[in-house]
Amino acid sequence: MVRDAFATAAREGWAEILISDDNFHDWPLGERAVVESLQAWAKGGRRFTMLAVSYDDVIRRHARFVGWRGTWDHIMTCRKSPSADPLELPSVLWSPGWVMQRLDPVRCAGVAGGEADRRVLVREVLNEWLRSKSSPGFPSTTLGL
């Protein structure tokens, strides 16, 4: 479903994508098809936001995505909430027209659809996390001395 969502985002030109998960361990972010979809999607005026407890698994498991993230840093906002309970952080792919929410990430069970009520409610929850329960994270480059 995540693969199809990113392909749809590219095809339909979604203005914004927001993804949230404790660590994105089981998301297909590093797959060639996903990164190609994101590459096709990324244009001026687009926004991509990520929220996680930790980005360690993203860096370790999704090298193609990490490379894409570095290229498109100017459209990305990455936030982290390291003290959050991993089961408390929503596991979501949100766009202005469609949302996928994993209600049970362990069993990968959830809901998806374009219903306005669901999209608004999920976005409000995500906004709360982004505004008051997280801080900047997952820099596009790591500068060392």
Predicted regions and their residues:
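PLD/PLD-like phosphodiesterase catalytic module centered on the HKD motif
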Residues: M1-L18, D22-L145
